[in-house]
Amino acid sequence: MARPGRKKRTALFIVEIICLLLFIGGLYVYGQIDSRLNKIETPQLDESKIVTNVTAPQMSGYTTYALFGIDQRSKNAALDAQNSDTIIIASINNDTKEVKLASVYRDTLLDIGNDTYTKANAAYAYGGPEQAISMLNTMLDLKITDYVTVNFNAMVAAIDALGGLDIPLSYAEMVFMNDYCIETSQETGKSYTPVELPDPKPENEEEILGTYHLNGVQSVSYCRIRYTASMDMGRTERQRRVIGMMVDKAKAAGITTIFNIMDEVFPMISTSITKTEILNLIPTLMGYNIADTTGFPAKYKFADVKKASMVVADTLEDNVKELHKFLYGADENYQPSQNIVEANARIIELVGGADTLVDQSPIAS
């Protein structure tokens, strides 16, 4: 009969072995992640070129990033000198780990720098991430200093590594997605199978017909759709929906899948966030949750400016208030800066007065 003391020592020894294995496993995983992070492009931002407005009190306790998607799907494409057709502001509550995403519509009329009022997506092409961040800061009363940029090829690779996504589709979305798939497949070198259209065509082409399993090419093509009734507002909503699905699947994925995503995607990412900062975030990533998403401006009209149709915030001041309420829980005491007031007046002047604005709010997607 074994002695109690020996049993206790044996049990303690087993626990020590398990702890040692977990520690070694943790070091292995850490090492694997650390080596893969070297694949990410981390250019040094010229901080002297980043302009900010005020640091409003409601931003305390939050971390804010700018996320840019570049409409360039070649693996060898540079992640600069391109229009940022996806512009997302990510606000993170440092205490609750809740993340809120706000898309800035690509055709929004804003000052992209040096009193150049044009579509917001042009800022990145004019001056890279520094100018795009400065536009967000000065036009939306923000203080963003870090960004992440990806191209479409990265999205395709990540979604394929996750095993695809189950996305609800309308007839109109099926038609446009199949059309976009041709170009996306050619430019990424990835294959796809067209979604079979129902016959006969439904009377309401915008009505969701069902959920379809889509691969990377199809999911990215779905994100590019902007010619349904919901126009660009629907496109940005689709993008945020896909991001949410990707986050949920990544949380449930095994470590091998995560490593595969890193191998495929990291070479197609550019960010100002340092490797040390990323490594420090990793232990808490599972606790982050996308709590809500929205689009900016929330209230808008349309106007022809410089022979192009643009989205005009109605008004810029009111929309910035709503944005800060959404991102940071700002109360009625928050008032936009004088820069916002002056920019709003300039926008109204450029469009020829508030009476020239056309209310063509799209149908919700």
Annotated model-derived regions:
Residues 2-97, 280:
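Entry/capping segment at the start of metal-dependent catalytic domains
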Residues 51-55, 62, 112, 256-259, ...:
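C-terminal solvent-exposed extensions
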Residues 57-59, 160-257:
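Flexible, polar/acidic helix-loop-strand segments at domain edges
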Residues 60-63, 82-87, 96-104, 115, ...:
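Extracytoplasmic
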